[in-house]
């Protein structure tokens, strides 16, 4: 991996971050969750709580200035 490139994962959150130019460190700072915690979610190794989803969605809205929905970032089960 070359400098300036980050590893990408096949999750909605990670694809959205890449498409919108949101860096993991910025999302961590804005959401209040650690980069390590967000990495586990981005990589699909951990399911976020409802509270965590709400915080990440709010952070993505602030960072992108777009009306982001939870369903754009996460696979929401029934």
Residues of each region from the PLM?
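DNA major-groove recognition helix of helix-turn-helix/homeodomain DNA-binding modules
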Residues: 51-70
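A short, basic/aromatic helix-end/turn motif that makes direct DNA contacts
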Residues: 31-33, 61-62
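Key DNA-contacting residues within the recognition helix of helix-turn-helix
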Residues: 39-40, 54-57, 74
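Recognition helix of helix-turn-helix/homeodomain-like DNA-binding domains
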Residues: 33-48
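Residues in the helix-turn-helix
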Residues: 26, 37, 72
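A short, Lys/Arg-rich alpha-helix, primarily the initiator
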Residues: 1-26, 30
């Amino acid at each position: 991996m070359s400098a300036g490139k980050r590893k990408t994962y096949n999750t909605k959150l990670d694809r959205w971050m890449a498409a919108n130019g949101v860096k993991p460190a910025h999302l961590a700072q804005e959401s209040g969750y650690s980069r390590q915690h967000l990495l586990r979610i981005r990589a699909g190794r951990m399911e976020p709580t409802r509270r965590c989803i709400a915080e990440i969605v709010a952070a993505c809205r602030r960072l992108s200035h777009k009306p982001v929905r939870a369903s754009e970032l996460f696979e929401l089960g029934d």
